[in-house]
């Protein structure tokens, strides 16, 4: 059964954006026109009087992002004789709930918060000036602004992605530059075979981050593979067609490897492909995941960073799986894995399970250097779980982690903070298996985690999580059988633990 997590996600996102923008605007209404070549006198003493004013010309409205991309300054040319401007600001995906509505700006610029991958609408209407007997403008100027990186191609709704990319091959320029492929918001697509991005840098995304396109995996060979930087954003996946022997995502089996993705054999022992730039899976929902979420595909590829952020993943294996949800034990490796603000779960009565959540068998970081006495301090590896919810995963005598090449290493970092685990890692506690049974790991950090068993008791953290911050309290999930993990446990709510989308 496919579950829709969008409404909950949108509600949460909307609150954050709206609050942030309103707070950002409050101290900025006093901006002046001086930066546009007009002094204060020109705003209020003008040769324009006894007139109905016009709103600012849309061609003279500019929007400039800050250096860090977190804010944007909107400016417009002064309308002589004006008494101010009514400013409104919208998320184009949610026009019924303005971010800012009819705020009076006494000036010609305003700075607001900027979110990545958004389509905004700016509205400006000139206010009259009673001292000059000038009347309000009757029309409103509208300007749209996009913070999406430029689109390379839009794939028509209803397409089979394998057929479309076969007819429209990714150009060789994508070896050196990221190309953005957009799917249409609310549309459905199919994936009937392996979609191999090979050594090309690709972003696959919906052009509306709050109205996801859906990709349906229709066959046992459906999946997305890569040997390069890859971004998957704002998409829903129905993985019904896949099997327990395949992965939603995997390293590519292609023999094509970009020159930038090879490793200097004189420096490194690693002889396979290397992906120095991140693989990111952001703001996506996954249903009916029957096999690995990410695996090495039995290919010797080293990914420096894999990030899964703001995702919901419903696992539905059709048989017991000896591998992991993240599985890199056959040839490849992930140097740094981060799972943030995510939910991974199986239904409460699901009959099959995974042996591991994350299993990695390869050597790590400095062990891969020919001369490992002179490696850079940056040559570290890490496993990071932050603000996430895990429910009924590795419940059948499973283990949270198993790593043969990185335990007891001074350059390994283990971060597990603000997470909720329910009925997970029943063969040894979550913190024990997370640290591969090694106590006193110098790079380990725990904080505000819950480790609850299915019978209502709590796991013994032993000498693994010694933070003193463990929350032994039922998080009181609203309705796990329907994929609703909203919490009402007082301590978890107070400390804002687990996946943030489930905070009340």
Regions found by a protein language model. Name each.
Residues 111-134:
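Beta-strand-rich modules
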Residues 228-239, 275-290, 303-319, 333-350, ...:
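Right-handed parallel beta-helix
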Residues 69-81:
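Conserved aromatic anchor
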Residues 465-504:
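C-terminal accessory segments
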């Amino acid at each position: 059964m496919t579950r829709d997590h969008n409404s909950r996600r949108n509600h949460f996102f909307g609150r954050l954006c709206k609050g942030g923008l309103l707070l950002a605007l409050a101290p900025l209404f006093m901006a002046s026109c001086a930066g546009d070549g007009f002094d204060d006198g020109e705003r209020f003493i003008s040769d324009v009087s006894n007139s109905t004013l016009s709103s600012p010309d849309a061609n003279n409205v500019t929007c400039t992002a800050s250096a860090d991309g977190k804010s944007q300054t909107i400016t417009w040319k002064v309308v002589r004789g004006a008494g101010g401007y009514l400013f409104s600001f919208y998320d184009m995906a949610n026009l019924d709930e303005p971010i800012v509505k009819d705020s009076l700006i006494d000036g010609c610029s305003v700075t607001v918060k900027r979110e990545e991958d958004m389509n905004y609408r700016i509205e400006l209407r000139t206010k009259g000036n009673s001292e000059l007997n000038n009347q309000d403008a009757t029309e409103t100027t509208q300007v749209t602004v996009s913070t999406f990186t430029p689109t390379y191609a839009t794939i028509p709704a209803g397409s089979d992605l394998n057929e479309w990319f076969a007819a429209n091959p990714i150009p060789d320029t994508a070896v050196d530059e990221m190309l953005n492929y957009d799917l249409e918001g609310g549309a459905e697509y199919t994936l009937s075979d392996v979609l191999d991005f090979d050594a090309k840098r690709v972003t696959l995304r919906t052009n509306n981050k709050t109205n996801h396109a859906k990709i349906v995996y229709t066959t046992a060979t459906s999946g997305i593979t890569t040997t390069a930087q890859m971004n998957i954003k704002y998409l829903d996946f129905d993985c019904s067609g896949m099997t327990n022997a395949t992965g939603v995502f995997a390293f590519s089996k292609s023999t094509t490897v970009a020159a930038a993705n090879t490793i200097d054999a004189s420096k490194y022992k690693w002889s396979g492909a290397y992906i120095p730039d991140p693989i990111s899976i952001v703001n996506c929902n996954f249903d009916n995941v029957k096999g690995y979420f990410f695996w090495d595909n039995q290919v010797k590829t080293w990914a420096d960073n894999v990030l899964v952020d703001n995702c919901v993943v419903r696992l539905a294996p059709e048989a017991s799986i000896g591998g992991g949800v993240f599985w890199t034990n056959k040839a490849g490796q992930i140097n740094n894995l981060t799972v943030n603000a995510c939910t991974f779960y199986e239904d409460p009565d699901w009959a099959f399970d995974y042996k591991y959540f994350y299993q990695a068998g390869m050597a790590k970081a400095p062990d891969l250097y020919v001369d490992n006495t002179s490696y850079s301090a940056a040559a570290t590896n890490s496993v990071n779980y932050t603000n996430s919810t895990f429910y009924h995963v590795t419940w059948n005598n499973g283990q949270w982690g198993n790593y043969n090449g990185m335990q007891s290493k001074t350059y390994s970092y283990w971060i597990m903070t603000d997470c909720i685990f329910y009925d997970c890692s029943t063969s040894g506690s979550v913190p024990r298996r997370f640290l591969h049974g090694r106590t006193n790991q110098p790079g380990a950090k725990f904080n505000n985690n819950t480790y609850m068993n299915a019978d209502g008791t709590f796991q013994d953290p032993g000498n693994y999580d010694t933070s003193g911050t463990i929350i032994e309290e039922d998080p009181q999930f609203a309705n796990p059988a329907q994929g609703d993990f909203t919490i009402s446990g007082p301590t978890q709510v107070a400390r804002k633990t687990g996946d943030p989308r489930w905070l009340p």
